Regions:
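Bacterial N-terminal signal peptides
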Residues: 9-19
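Low-complexity, acidic/polar, glycine-enriched regions of mature
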Residues: 23-200
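Bacterial N-terminal signal peptides that target proteins for export
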Residues: 1-10
Length: 200
């Protein structure tokens, strides 16, 4: 028969092991440079609306489908991969007066926290999009600023699909718009990301 001391030792072992089991559910997902993921920005100024896009997005996401609030991720896109519908404008955008691709070659987006509504379950349902609020950091022109994004997360056995939208300002990232184009370039830039991350 099991004595009291043995029972206590077994109970302690189970309690200590529980956090390890919980952490084991976290999986690392990779965003590959395969054209499936994208980042888009829109400048809606009085005289012109400009849209730019890149499909050169890479990064990693560590997430537990049983508790999506623990998710963390880091993603980047090369500045030189941004494309609008105007080659000359693309050159200016990547130049030292704007995003300065030579000095700051990448734009970064980092997920630091995922927040759900008060009544929302932290566990993702397979193949169903879940609405989330994402807190993180956005780096452009060498300047990092906090961002809050609204979006969705959809999980399958081998993939996480994340969509998020947020707004950044050129002023926050120390990008000065020349007066001659001030009515064609907005200070507030709408950013949206569409990330397909596959399990390692």
């Amino acid at each position: 028969m099991m004595n009291s001391a043995t029972r206590v030792c077994l109970m302690l072992a189970v309690c200590l092991a529980a956090p390890v089991f919980a952490r084991a559910d976290a999986t690392t997902y990779r965003v590959l440079d395969d054209g499936k993921s994208s980042a888009t920005f829109v400048s809606d100024a009085p005289l012109e609306t400009m849209t730019g896009k890149t499909s050169k997005v890479t990064g990693t996401l560590t997430a537990d489908p049983m508790d999506i609030t623990t998710a963390k991720g880091s993603f980047k896109s090369p500045v030189v991969s941004l494309r609008t519908d105007n080659e000359l404008r693309d050159e200016h955008l990547q130049g030292d007066g704007w995003l300065d691709a030579k000095k700051n070659p990448n734009i970064h987006f980092e997920i630091t926290e995922v927040v759900l509504g008060k009544k929302a379950a932290t566990e993702l349902k397979k193949n169903k999009a879940t609405k989330v609020q994402v807190k993180g950091k956005f780096t452009a022109h060498g300047i990092t600023k906090p961002v809050a994004a609204s979006g969705t997360v959809k999980w399958s056995d081998a993939e996480m699909h994340i969509k998020a939208k947020f707004t950044v300002t050129l002023e926050d990232h120390e990008i000065s718009v020349p007066s001659i184009v001030r009515l064609k370039v907005a200070n507030d830039i709408a950013v949206s990301v569409d990330l397909h991350a596959v399990a390692k």
